[in-house]
């Protein structure tokens, strides 16, 4: 432990050569831990000014309920999917008497780490988070978990820590979308994806890849690109159009990117879907505001938010063990509109 750094359950576990879960049980007077060991751990915690999350403990052991505050970290507010998840979290939390404190990471690791530190200081009873694109170090997550604060990831999960997670079926959603493009006549389908350190990017690419291979189509790396917003799509698409054998279909990681592709193709005189077909991934409001309306994969963000909030509150209230890792997958649905045949 660093000098002057706050004590965590992980530090106590290291001192006694036991697991964090055992420390947590001892601090809660669990009969599963011997009395001698419980007293030793509790005394050590007191001597080092360590106290479990005050709100979480009060919720589990008291009929007088203190303020119930859940910290929520969002990478960006402008994305329809994140706003729909937030709505699901807030409505589900409010129905059980909780409030949420929302913070924006802005896709930046430094801001995300500072938010986690702030949430710890504010004594939130739990944290729901979607990882920023820039995040490659996960110590700030682990510190919250070690301090006994339950955490649930949504959408962009972190495989570097053991925490519950709620995602949509990115793999199957992508595979079904690309399969539909192939069955609609596309033979060269470009993939516009996000950073590959994100699990959702990997899963959507794997769905794309497996759909092609299943239909005997080889992957062409020249039409697989990192592109996850409209501005990038408007820069990259003209370059792909100049290839000797340009794409006749595009699968984009989100609707914003797909719409960038759509308007670039239309500006170049291409007919959609007659000449080129496009599929996105979100089914937000923008999907029905473009012309033609966008074929896309519906993510059901509200349901993701509901599930994430439910998992977290069950842990806070002791209805689900702190150390239990829950993984829930929300099914997607292909919504066929005017950018495909």
Model segments located where?
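Short acidic capping loops at alpha-helix termini that bridge into adjacent secondary structure
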Residues: 188, 219-223, 271-277
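Short helix-capping segments at alpha-helix termini
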Residues: 95-96, 147, 212-219, 242-246, ...
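Flexible loop/turn connectors
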Residues: 238-341
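Hinge/beta->alpha junction and helix N-cap segments in small-molecule ligand-binding domains
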Residues: 74-84, 102-111, 156, 165-176, ...
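N-terminal helix-turn-helix DNA-binding module of bacterial transcription factors
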Residues: 1-66, 341
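Short beta-strand segments enriched in small/hydrophobic residues
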Residues: 15, 20-25, 61-78, 180, ...
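Alpha-helical recognition/docking segments in bacterial nutrient-uptake
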Residues: 1-7, 64-179, 183, 240-242
């Amino acid at each position: 432990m660093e000098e002057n750094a706050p004590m965590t359950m992980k530090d106590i576990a290291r001192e006694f050569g036991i697991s964090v879960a055992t420390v947590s049980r001892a601090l809660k007077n669990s009969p599963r831990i011997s009395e001698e060991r419980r007293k030793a751990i509790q005394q050590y915690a007191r001597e080092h000014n360590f106290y479990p999350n005050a709100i979480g403990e009060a919720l589990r052991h008291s009929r007088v309920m203190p303020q119930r505050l859940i910290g929520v970290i969002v990478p960006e507010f402008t994305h329809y999917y994140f706003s729909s998840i937030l709505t699901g979290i807030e409505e589900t939390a409010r129905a059980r008497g909780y409030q949420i404190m929302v913070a924006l990471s802005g896709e930046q690791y430094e801001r995300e780490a500072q938010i986690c530190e702030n949430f710890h200081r504010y004594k939130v009873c739990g944290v729901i988070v979607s990882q920023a694109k820039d995040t490659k170090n996960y110590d700030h997550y682990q510190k919250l978990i070690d301090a006994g604060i339950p955490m649930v990831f949504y959408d962009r999960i972190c495989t570097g820590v053991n925490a519950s997670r709620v995602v949509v079926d990115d793999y199957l959603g992508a595979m079904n979308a690309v399969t539909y493009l192939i069955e609609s006549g596309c033979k060269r389908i470009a993939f516009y994806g996000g950073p590959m350190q994100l699990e959702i990017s990997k899963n959507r690419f794997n769905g794309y890849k497996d759909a092609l291979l299943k239909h005997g189509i080889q992957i062409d790396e020249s039409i697989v690109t990192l592109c996850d917003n409209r501005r990038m799509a408007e820069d990259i698409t003209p370059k792909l159009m100049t290839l000797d054998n340009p794409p006749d279909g595009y699968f984009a990681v989100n609707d914003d990117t797909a719409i960038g592709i759509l308007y670039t193709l239309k500006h170049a005189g291409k007919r959609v879907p007659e000449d080129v077909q496009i599929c996105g991934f979100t089914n937000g409001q923008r999907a029905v505001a473009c012309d033609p309306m966008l074929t896309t994969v519906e993510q059901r963000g509200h349901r993701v938010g509901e599930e994430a909030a439910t998992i977290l509150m069950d842990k806070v209230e002791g209805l689900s063990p702190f150390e239990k890792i829950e993984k829930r997958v929300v099914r997607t649905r292909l919504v066929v509109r005017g950018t495909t045949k």
